[in-house]
């Protein structure tokens, strides 16, 4: 049987980090087994579902590179199918109409609680065989089996057993004419041939209810894999403040999509002690059965380390567009400075994120207006005009502007003055960047461009008072 998985977010908010991991594991499992991955949008909550959230989910999936073979499929476009299946259950005596008011339902629950029983529907309409009537309280309820036990072997959690006596006759169609979650997902997964349902363990309690519906429909029951939640660094439930933010905020924070993918893959799954994986390695090695049953903790330092690895090792040309995105967010005119790929080469050993890289790179795209006063006092003092002047002279004479030609000119300047390279580099670094910290001096000067470098040296000479 061909493996088919699905990711089925509700568009009531953005795709957060937990949802992204679920999508990744569903995608990896399908790809690992040579199967198909389906994207379904569970938008039957009409009050909370928004087009903005749908667009954000699709954008995040695209940014992460999680392509789907089918979809997006929208539940709101399948209501007629849900009605058809509900009517089938009604005709077979496996579901029934009920018309209790909210007050009557509240009274049932209160009576159960007074007896120290679980608050739930008491099955009052179960055997009444009530006909359809136009009523604002009309619902369709599923006849849950009265006796026996629901047993399933979760691919992550192991064997789980729940007595049917713990379950009531749940509503499968609401008064507004829309299906409930537990009913719609069963019909969807049945129709779509889903073989493995991979989702968060907050859905474990839904699973026995859904299995009973599958069996009532004589539909094949898929395998289930319930992943533990992701905790924050203190071991508490994730919040927006501690990492549960919109996935696209990780893009804005300067993380590479494949770095986030690598990190999320390891957030609950492992292959020995290996930390870094190519996409092909993930596809070859991932098996949902190997996902840990214990909750994973978010570790932003580890994510930073993974991201820095890819900043250091990826082709600079592939990183450049993402650096340009970060620079644009800072209001930088990219055309006013060096090629982004050259900036990547210069800075990637010094930062963990593209946001940091962009912030450091601004100096090469905008006029230098401020200087670190401590750096000026130390390196642009009287006497610094000598190495600066010689460097300017030789840089102005460079034929083809490159890191190599700049490096040669600066070494020639140091040799001509019989100075160590640091005596040339440090005043030049302050002249170009306004600070005493920057990448290799040849890269620093090269990125300023010939005209920009000469202008900044001239400004430094004026500052020294030796122009």
UniProtKB/Swiss-Prot annotation:
Its EC number is 6.1.1.17. A motif ('HIGH' region) lies at residues 9-19. It is found in: Cytoplasm. A motif ('KMSKS' region) lies at residues 237-241. GO terms for cellular component: cytosol. Gene3D superfamilies: 1.10.10.350, HUPs. ATP binds at residue 240. Its main location: cytoplasm. InterPro entries: aa-tRNA-synth_I_cd-bd, aa-tRNA-synth_I_codon-bd_sub2, aa-tRNA-synth_I_CS, aa_tRNA-synth_I_cd-bd_sf, Glu-tRNA-ligase_bac/mito, Glu/Gln-tRNA-synth, Glu/Gln-tRNA-synth_Ib_cat-dom, GluQ/Sye. It catalyses: tRNA(Glu) + L-glutamate + ATP = L-glutamyl-tRNA(Glu) + AMP + diphosphate. GO terms for biological process: glutamyl-tRNA aminoacylation. One of its GO terms (molecular function) is tRNA binding. Pfam families: Anticodon_2, tRNA-synt_1c. Keywords: Aminoacyl-tRNA synthetase, ATP-binding, Cytoplasm, Ligase, Nucleotide-binding, Protein biosynthesis. Monomer. Catalyzes the attachment of glutamate to tRNA(Glu) in a two-step reaction: glutamate is first activated by ATP to form Glu-AMP and then transferred to the acceptor end of tRNA(Glu). PANTHER family: GLUTAMATE--TRNA LIGASE, GLUTAMATE--TRNA LIGASE, MITOCHONDRIAL-RELATED. Belongs to the class-I aminoacyl-tRNA synthetase family. Glutamate--tRNA ligase type 1 subfamily. This is Glutamate--tRNA ligase. It comes from Xanthomonas axonopodis pv. citri (strain 306).
């Amino acid at each position: 049987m061909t493996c088919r998985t699905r990711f089925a977010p509700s568009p009531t908010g953005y795709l957060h980090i937990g949802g992204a991991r679920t999508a990744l594991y569903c995608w990896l499992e399908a790809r690992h087994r040579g199967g198909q991955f389906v994207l379904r949008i569970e938008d039957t909550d009409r009050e909370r579902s928004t087009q903005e959230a749908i667009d954000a989910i699709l954008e995040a999936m695209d940014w992460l590179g999680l392509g789907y073979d089918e979809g997006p499929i929208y539940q709101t476009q399948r209501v007629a199918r849900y009605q058809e299946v509900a009517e089938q259950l009604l005709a077979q005596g496996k579901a029934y109409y009920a018309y209790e008011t909210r007050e009557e339902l509240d009274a049932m629950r209160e009576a159960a609680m007074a007896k120290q029983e679980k608050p739930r529907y008491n099955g009052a309409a179960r055997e009444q065989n009530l006909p359809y009537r136009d009523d604002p309280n009309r619902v369709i309820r599923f006849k849950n089996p009265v006796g026996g036990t629901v047993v399933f072997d979760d691919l992550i959690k192991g064997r789980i057993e729940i007595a049917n006596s713990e379950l009531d006759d749940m509503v499968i169609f609401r008064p507004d004419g829309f299906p409930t979650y537990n009913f719609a997902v069963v019909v969807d997964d049945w129709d779509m041939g889903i073989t493995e349902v991979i989702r968060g363990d907050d859905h474990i309690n839904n699973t026995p209810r859904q299995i009973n519906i599958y069996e009532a429909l004589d539909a094949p029951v898929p395998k289930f894999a319930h992943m533990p939640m992701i905790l924050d660094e203190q071991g508490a439930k994730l919040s927006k403040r501690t990492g549960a933010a919109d996935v696209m905020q990780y893009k804005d924070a300067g993380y590479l999509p494949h770095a986030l993918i690598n990190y999320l893959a390891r957030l609950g799954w492992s292959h020995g002690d290996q930390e870094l994986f190519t996409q092909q390695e993930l596809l070859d090695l991932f098996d949902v059965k190997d996902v840990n049953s214990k909750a994973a903790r978010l570790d932003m330092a580890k994510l930073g380390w993974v991201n820095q690895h890819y900043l250091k090792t990826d082709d600079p040309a592939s990183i450049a567009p993402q650096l340009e995105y970060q620079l644009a967010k800072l209001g930088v005119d990219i055309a006013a400075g060096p090629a982004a790929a050259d900036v990547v080469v210069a800075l990637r050993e010094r930062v963990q994120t593209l946001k940091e890289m962009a912030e450091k790179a601004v100096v090469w795209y905008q006029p230098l207006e401020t200087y670190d006063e401590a750096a000026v006092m130390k390196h642009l003092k009287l006497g610094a005009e000598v190495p600066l002047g010689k460097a300017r002279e030789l840089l102005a004479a460079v034929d083809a502007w490159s890191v190599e030609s700049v490096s040669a000119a600066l070494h020639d300047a140091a040799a001509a003055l019989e100075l160590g390279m640091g005596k040339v580099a440090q005043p030049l670094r302050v002249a170009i960047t306004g600070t005493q910290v920057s990448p290799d001096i040849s890269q620093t000067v090269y990125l300023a461009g010939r005209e920009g470098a000469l202008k900044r040296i001239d400004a430094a000479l004026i500052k020294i008072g030796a122009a």
